[in-house]
A protein has these predicted regions:
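Face-selective signature of the C-terminal outer-membrane beta-barrel domain
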Residues: 1-146
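Short coil-to-beta transitions that initiate beta-strands within beta-rich domains
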Residues: 106, 162-163
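Outer/extracellular conduits and scaffolds centered on Gram-negative outer-membrane beta-barrels
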Residues: 111-115, 157-162
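Surface-exposed extracellular loop regions of Gram-negative outer-membrane beta-barrel proteins
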Residues: 140-142, 174-190
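Glycine-rich and polybasic anion-binding loops at the starts of cofactor/ligand-binding domains
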Residues: 169
Length: 190
């Protein structure tokens, strides 16, 4: 794992530039086995062993800049890059054999790029405050599954997604406030 962090403070403490970059490389190995012994003599016993290993690479870069225009108005802009690359091998063996079962074994390649930019403006005036923003993402997904002697399955997708945000708040008393929010989000598996 490699990380780089940079923070620039300006004369105004509300104005700042932050850059974070992370790079991770990982290897994973797993072996498991399963045995089914039947009491019924007409059914043969069954043994399965599988081995999987993978190489994973991941990079994340965040650049965020915030700038106050007045005491009541602040803008934030930023960029985010999320890159992941995974290569996995899945080998299956049946009935105690050390010969790989090519009908079930496969290799999988996966690459994902997500580039995003965002801008938000926050304001406050008396008892009213709010924030409005927009994040735009371009996602590229590439995946390929290879099996010996079979047609390879692959997926190549690119899509653009907008993510608007709106948040309004009104301070009724020192102990009460009314809020209204809208945001569009996406949850991705890691």
């Amino acid at each position: 794992t490699f990380s780089l962090n940079f923070q620039k403070q300006f004369d105004n403490p509300e104005q700042e530039l932050m850059i974070d970059a992370n790079w991770n490389i990982g290897k994973h190995y797993r072996e498991s086995s399963q045995t089914l012994d039947y009491w019924n003599p007409t059914m043969p016993n069954y043994e399965k062993r599988d081995v999987s290993e993978s190489d994973n690479k991941r990079a994340v870069v965040n650049i965020n800049y915030s700038h106050p225009f007045f005491e009541t108005l602040k803008m934030e802009v930023g960029y985010n890059l999320n890159y992941s690359n995974r290569y996995s091998i899945y080998d299956y063996y049946l009935n105690g054999s050390d010969v790989r079962n090519d009908d079930m074994s496969y290799e999988f390649y996966n690459t994902e790029y997500i580039n995003a930019v965002y801008a938000t403006v926050g304001y406050s005036y008396g008892k009213l405050s709010g924030q409005i923003g927009l994040r735009g993402e371009i996602t590229n997904l590439n995946g390929r599954k290879e099996m010996l002697g079979k047609d390879n399955d692959s997926i190549n997708k690119q899509y653009t997604s907008p993510f608007p945000t709106l948040h309004l708040s009104y301070q009724i008393t020192d102990m009460q406030s009314a809020q209204l929010s809208y945001s569009r989000r996406i949850n991705r598996p890691n």
